[in-house]
Amino acid sequence: MIKYEIKEKDGYLDMIDLPHNCIFNKVRTGCGGTTIALRNEENYIIAVPTTELIVNKLNSTENLFGLYGDFTPTLKDGLIGYTQRDGVKKIMCTYDKLPKLVELINTTDYRLLVDEYHNLLKQYMFRSTAINGVLDNFREFKSFCFIFNKLTARLDDCRTNHHDRAVNSRGI
């Protein structure tokens, strides 16, 4: 594992972007990891385990497209319209929607943040289809960052160990 010293200010991560192509242990919750992806100037897909996380961010974030629930033609049209707009794009989806999203976008235009990475392992027994969709598609993106806030599993506990490196922030 490669350890990086990550700067923090007032208890929040002080970064322009998340580390790339890694598993990032941010050590504690609420320190702004997801917020970095939502506020920077990079196109991001943010995959999360629950709809509630998306709804929470939709209420507090401008220019965020939330992809959850039934994948209706109206939702698909809205997504396509959003991706064709000018400017930076931020799409937050549940784990199970990622494969459908990959079919509709140019993945190399986006970085992928897989939030609450520890849930991929904890929930595999009852969400294997959704989790396999994440694991089968994350390398399609410009870069990826699997983020979690505690050491809940060893890297080799993954279904497949594709990750190039792990980043452990200290002092946050």
Mark where each language-model region is.
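Structural recognition of the conserved hydrophobic beta-strand(s) that form the central parallel beta-sheet
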Residues: I46-A47, I91-C93, L113, K142-N149
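SF2 helicase catalytic motif II
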Residues: N106-S143
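Conserved Walker A/P-loop ATP-binding site and its immediately adjacent core
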Residues: T35-G69
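Walker A/P-loop
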Residues: P19-L38
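Pre-Walker A adenine-sensing motif
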Residues: M1-H20
